[in-house]
Regions:
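Mature catalytic domains of secreted/periplasmic carbohydrate-active enzymes
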Residues: 2-458
């Protein structure tokens, strides 16, 4: 996919590794619909290289940052008239958290006005290199964006004060314990918010993250901007508002998990097609996304404490204006916290507030965190973000198999309690995912785990 990329003047220009001209025996993993984008791996041979064609409207210096994984490797970035070098191993940035992916500053190169060829090569790949992307931005714009990101960042102290939260993948795929699954709108109508809030309150959780859409895109409230894209994906009942009220009465905040719905890509006229997603022309998709976020944010105001945006690898390759996305995400509540899940990669933007931390291992990863429990990464791939993790307690994110009970926790209780206490003391905020039946109830064994952590911390 050897296309010319136009330099952005107002943000970093993203050069994805998977669209580079590859010279060597690289391995590239492509998704079926080009929604989720992945890294290039098996960079093991001297002389292997990746090249991009860039059209610049100006002549001047640009900072180059690599989202890269390496072990004692040396890379060279060349435009033919300047070279930036950096040993990823010497900076020891490959050991951050539980992954050695990081954002590595490669230095400054000079671009001429017009077409440039930028090549990243390695004279010593060391233990092997993997590359997700390069980012090119002028030094002045870089400083301006860093300042704006700090100004937009929300206070996350309430998350640390909450100590921990719960996550629930309650979606169109959720199944009852027994019997036939209800259609989504009926399940929304019948959800018992008072019983649910009482259960959450007993666990001691200070907030919940409710998954509004996962594999399938639905939303449990009457949202016009969603209906405008595709009718039949919302509900008459505003379950989100009802949950805000019931949880607020218990001193519990509500956050929402959001998935853009790319799993619908196989449907010829389905949700994904109608969103306007197009990797080479993302304006319609981003406009639709911003409209949805703005409407939801203004509808719930301060009642909506945060967003958890899954699949950052869908957003980032579109090279969006993350400041614009952040403004939409915080519509109605400038203090709302947001994150873009980077999976194994480093942070995709500074225009966010907390690190996703998908997986139990992040509960035990304290690198780059100060010992005072303040919980903000001082360096590394998630620098300046609030430490957070979300993980599965039982078997799955969502209870989507009919006629079976929720399985018991996969983690021994003693180990779970100790890991939770250690993480919370370090300032990490855990969101524990509990499987949930369609009627809004959970496993007694799992909720007992959570009541135990409440008792332990009291």
């Amino acid at each position: 996919m050897w296309n010319t990329v136009k330099m952005k003047w107002d943000r970093p220009t993203v050069l994805m590794a998977d669209i580079a001209n590859l010279s060597g025996q690289f391995s590239v993993w492509y998704s079926g619909n080009w929604a989720k984008r992945f890294h290039v791996s098996q960079w093991n041979q001297e002389g292997d290289s990746l090249s991009w064609s860039i059209e610049s409207g100006f002549s001047g210096k640009v900072n180059v940052t690599a989202l890269i994984k390496g072990d004692g490797a040396e890379v060279q970035l060349s435009t033919g008239h300047s070279i930036a070098k950096n040993r990823t191993g010497e900076q020891k940035l490959t050991k951050t958290i539980s992954t050695n992916w990081n954002r590595v500053d490669l230095g400054i190169i000079h671009l001429k006005a017009g077409i440039n060829t930028v090549t990243l090569s390695s004279s010593r790949p060391g233990g092997g290199l993997e590359l997700y992307s390069l980012e090119l931005v002028s030094p002045d714009i870089r400083l301006c964006l860093e300042k704006q990101a700090v100004e937009m960042r929300s206070d996350t102290s309430w998350m640390r004060e909450s100590k921990y939260g719960l996550q629930f993948h309650w979606t169109s795929e959720s199944q009852p314990r027994y019997g036939k699954q209800k259609v989504y709108a009926d399940a929304v109508r019948d959800f018992d918010v008072q019983s649910f809030a009482q259960m959450v309150n007993q666990t001691g959780a200070g907030y919940i993250i409710l998954t509004t859409s996962h594999a399938e895109h639905y939303f449990p409230a009457p949202i016009k901007s969603i209906d405008a894209i595709m009718p039949g994906r919302t509900s008459d009942r505003d379950l989100v508002q009802d949950l805000i009220g019931a949880l607020e009465a218990c001193g519990i905040r509500l956050m929402l998990y959001y998935h853009v719905g790319h799993d619908h890509w196989v449907e010829p006229d389905g949700w994904w097609t109608r969103t306007g997603f197009a990797p080479d022309n993302p304006n319609v998709f981003i406009s639709n996304w911003c409209a949805i976020m703005t409407e939801i944010g203004e509808r719930y105001g301060e009642g909506l404490a945060g967003w958890f945006y899954d699949d950052g690898c869908v957003y980032y390759p579109l090279n969006p204006d993350f400041r614009q996305l952040g403004q939409a995400a915080k519509a109605g509540n400038s203090s709302r916290v947001i994150c873009y899940n980077p999976w194994i990669w480093p942070r995709f933007t500074d225009f966010q507030d907390y690190f996703c931390g998908e997986g139990y291992s992040f509960l035990k990863s304290h690198e780059w965190l100060p010992g005072d429990g303040s919980g903000i990464f001082t360096d590394g791939p998630h620098k300046s973000l609030q430490a957070h993790t979300n993980f599965i307690l039982e078997k799955s994110w969502c209870h989507s198999t009919p006629e079976i009970p929720i399985p018991p926790p996969q983690i021994p209780k003693g180990e779970f309690l100790q890991d939770m206490v250690n993480a919370i003391e370090r300032g990490i905020v855990p969101s524990v995912n509990l499987e949930i039946y369609q009627n809004g109830s959970c496993s007694d064994i799992s909720t007992d785990y959570m009541r135990a952590i409440k008792t332990t911390l009291t």
